[in-house]
Amino acid sequence: MIKAKRLEKGNTIGVVSPASPSENRSEIVRAREYLENLGYKVVIGRNVNKTKGFTAASEQERAADINEMFAREDIDAVFATQGGYGSAQIIDKLDYELIRSKPKIFTGFSDITSLHLAIQKFSGLVTFYSPGMAQFNEEDLSEYTKESFFRTLGIPEPAGEIKKSSPKKWLTSIHGGVCEAPVVGGCLTLICASLGTPYEIDCKDKILFFEDVDAEPWIMDHALSHLRNAGKLNDAAGFMIGHCENCVPYDYKPGFVCDTTLEDVLTYYLEPLKKPALYGLPMGHGDDLATLPLGVRCRLDADKKTFTVLEAGVI
């Protein structure tokens, strides 16, 4: 895997909106001020503040912003504002050879999973599953999230063990065991959307990381059955399931009543595989979000309930 140079004070961050537009432009303004106060320079993409239907700007405009940020010599890192919807629309319009030849830090989560998968597959670049740029302000960015983000991007050393954000949080070992392998994945919905396309996730002998938000257990069941039928669960060396925000049974209409939990679903699909599987670390949607370098080697110990990044994500 190719690695970008570490993020240093004085570096310039290019901001793009590959998916949904920000609900409020003030989010981008506040985030820019926050990053500048920390000592970084910030360049907002030409089309970040546009809106077209479900997305921020047209497919061509959103892709052009990303290609431009990677091409510009004065840009050191590329931050996505947020997820939402629409990243998959532009993955066939990115210049992957350009990205390979000019590796830069690329961050984002949720819907940005489509870009992570595509960039890793066609450019071989380590990217970072991390909070969106629009979250960067004193009110929304927890100390846990901030420390993990700037340490992982700013220090050319392994991030080490990703720990619980609070002693009150719980972790569940779906199945015990230990494995060491590169980590791949992201938001489960987008992982499934990659199947059958040139950008399909490769889970062979890798730790599959996934999380999701607002997905009822039956929706998670649907996604995992899809991955099982595609052979991806059998391919994986182990499973790291992050925090799944609001993935609980909703109120059902008469005739469709179910109290099956997400943990029930995870156990049903993953326990029979007899591979290490750990659920509950703060990677995903929530108040606390650890930054995960995708593509680097990690150690999953489901017996001790630990997940450790063994390789630096930057140089």
Could you describe each region identified by the protein language model?
Residues 1-74:
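ATP/NTP phosphate-donor binding region
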Residues 22, 26-27, 178-213:
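Conserved beta-alpha junction segments in alpha/beta enzyme cores
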Residues 74, 100-105, 123-125, 236-237, ...:
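A short helix->loop->beta-strand "cap" motif at the edges of active sites that frequently abuts
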Residues 77-88:
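N-terminal glycine-rich "phosphate-gripper" loop used for MgATP/nucleotide binding
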Residues 124-190:
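Conserved anion/nucleotide-ligand pocket segment
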Residues 202-262:
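Internal helical hairpin/lid segments
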Residues 241-315:
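ATP/nucleoside-binding phosphotransfer catalytic cores, i.e., glycine-rich phosphate-binding loops
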